[in-house]
Amino acid sequence: MKLCGFDIGLDQPFFLIAGPCVVESEQLQMDTAGTLKEITSSLGIPFIFKSSFDKANRSSGTSFRGPGREKGLEILAKVKRELGLPVLTDVHTEDDITEAAKVVDVLQTPAFLCRQTDFIRAVAQSGKPVNIKKGQFLAPHDMKNVIDKARAAAKEAGLPEDSFMACERGASFGYNNLVSDMRSLAIMRETGAPVVFDATHSVQLPGGQGTTSGGQREMVPVLSRAAVAVGVAGLFMETHPDPAKALSDGPNAVPLKHMKALLETLLALDQVTKKNAFLEDVFQS
């Protein structure tokens, strides 16, 4: 699959989607995007900047949601224009899809909306590549139905059917907890779509702090190493210069100062993983 001018897949080095969870300020977006651009350029990692203009799924009604669609997209457009970076944001409504598609390069669907057929059809007909997140409640093999819906909708609209990615972000495991079943990364390949691992939301503890979600950011390196060892097309990571002060998902954000060291380790693993054939593809024969 071609994404933002580069090839992605298991025959390519992993690409990275990264940035702050939510648009907090123009300065934070520009500074973080600039730092990430420097890091990924030095390592040769294809990079897409991400941030959300609205966090519609919050633990509490008083939680910070973002600057809103108009202001948020304006800031993301500036990142794209001044830093020359492709940009991704998530959408929650059909109106969001229409407006965001005018600005960003890649759209993303929230995990909780993966079974909403009309929504998936609408985003699939936006004309943009889409990173479709697997719901925390969904079996990995059920993502084939979701991807098939998107492809059918794209075909109806006369659009390419290979513009979709399947993203793993953990599975609910009791109350306020998620686990990552690494088998899911191999199972989701059966969708025929490139598989992306969301390394930061996978360590989230949903609602674990009462009115906010908790997280175990120290487990991001652990799970991201495991995912790269399995073999993925891309990685998704939220990052912040000061996670303790982040206005959303700080407990599971990668400290920006540690991003380069983490990516260096993951690059080395990725090269080993993709050097030879994936034996799981032949064990049944």
From Swiss-Prot:
Superkingdom: Bacteria
Pfam families: DAHP_synth_1
GO cellular component: cytoplasm
GO molecular function terms attached to this record: 3-deoxy-8-phosphooctulonate synthase activity
UniProt subcellular location: Cytoplasm
EC numbers, comma separated: 2.5.1.55
An example Gene Ontology biological process: keto-3-deoxy-D-manno-octulosonic acid biosynthetic process
EC primary class: transferase
Broad class of where this protein is predominantly found: cytoplasm
Coiled coil: none
Keywords: Cytoplasm, Lipopolysaccharide biosynthesis, Transferase
Catalysed transformations (reactions): D-arabinose 5-phosphate + phosphoenolpyruvate + H2O = 3-deoxy-alpha-D-manno-2-octulosonate-8-phosphate + phosphate
InterPro entries: Aldolase_TIM (IPR013785), DAHP1/KDSA (IPR006218), KDO8P_synthase (IPR006269)
Listed pathway(s): Carbohydrate biosynthesis; 3-deoxy-D-manno-octulosonate biosynthesis; 3-deoxy-D-manno-octulosonate from D-ribulose 5-phosphate: step 2/3; Bacterial outer membrane biogenesis; lipopolysaccharide biosynthesis
Protein family (similarity comment): Belongs to the KdsA family.
Family annotation (HAMAP family): KDO8P_synth
Name assigned to this protein: 2-dehydro-3-deoxyphosphooctonate aldolase
Native species: Variovorax paradoxus (strain S110)
